[in-house]
Amino acid sequence: MKYYLAPMEGLTTYNFRTNWNHCYGGMDKYFTPFISNRHMNSRERNDVLPEHNVGMYTVPQILTNKAEEFLSLAEQLAGYGYHEVNLNLGCPSGTVVAVSYTHLRAHETVL
């Protein structure tokens, strides 16, 4: 069985993940809170810096409904040494739903 630490808005920053890993360990992957801008702000950048994620398999999560933003962020994250990203296709968080970042709602008939 694999154990993943899912992101929780406002809680699972790199400080939380680092402390969890130090105290409890046991996670196969640690997912970051989503990045939703083509240009990462300082909080988002700090969250994915390799030196803030030592000893953990960290997977940055991208939330966007624009292909060019996804590609730009994926390229930036590759520059930090990441080989995997998670594309969030529909976060139930109120702050996300209110801004219409979710992908699946627009294509419910396809599903």
Annotate each language-model stretch with its function.
Residues 37, 92-94:
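Active-site loop signature of alpha/beta-hydrolase-fold enzymes
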